[in-house]
């Protein structure tokens, strides 16, 4: 079996290139060296470069995020599809296999996935017909409830400017009680991205860390 030195060796063999994001051109904090150049060259040669990302963000949000980092549609890729897009299509088509229309979002809010649809995001888990499992993160107050785990939290890069800080965790302990309570309800759980871990670069600097995710 031949092991290729890099993507550039085989890119010219194909008309359409399907490219994952995390671990392919993005390491959680920066672009892998040479990755953007290879993608740009493929686009220049007329290849269709489609990014397939399992982020729960909608593609429009991901496009804007990568623009801020230096990657641009039409220059480095031609198409961008996310797990959030696919989930959103199922929502709009009312194809979720759940007993009602009330959704409780556990974790970081992702209300945009359900906006302008037949489904309603409810603030209380007791009102829910199903749970949507979003990104497990903690507010500062929630984080401080676990003083013995203080060295296991990192300021999330997903904290939007002007919003209260959100913290990623290296351990699952802070989330177990609330998940157990949901499990006891016996309701369906929905998840657009069941990754167990993701290497994320802390917002306040440092190397990417293997933080807990939805899986």
What residue spans do the PLM features occupy?
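HAD-like aspartate-dependent phosphatase fold
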Residues: 1-215
């Amino acid at each position: 079996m031949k092991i290729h030195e890099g993507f550039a060796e085989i890119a010219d063999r194909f008309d359409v290139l399907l490219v994952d994001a995390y671990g392919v051109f993005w390491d959680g904090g920066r672009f892998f060296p040479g990755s953007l150049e290879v993608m740009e060259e493929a686009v220049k040669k007329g290849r269709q470069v489609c990014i397939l990302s399992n982020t729960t963000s909608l593609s429009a949000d991901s496009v804007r995020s990568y623009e801020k980092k230096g990657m641009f549609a039409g220059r480095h890729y031609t198409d961008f599809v996310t797990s959030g897009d696919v989930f959103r299509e199922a929502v709009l088509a009312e194809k979720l296999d759940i007993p009602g229309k009330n959704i409780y979002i556990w974790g970081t809010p992702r209300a945009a996935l359900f906006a302008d649809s037949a489904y309603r995001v409810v603030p209380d888990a007791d009102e829910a017909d199903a749970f949507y499992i979003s990104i497990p993160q903690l507010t500062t107050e929630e984080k401080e409830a676990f003083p013995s785990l203080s060295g296991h939290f990192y300021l999330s890069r997903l904290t939007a400017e002007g919003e209260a800080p959100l913290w990623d965790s290296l351990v699952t302990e802070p989330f177990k009680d609330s998940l157990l309570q949901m499990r006891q309800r016996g309701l369906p759980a929905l998840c657009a991205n069941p990754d167990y871990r993701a290497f994320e670069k802390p917002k306040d600097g440092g190397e990417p860390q293997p933080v807990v995710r939805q899986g």
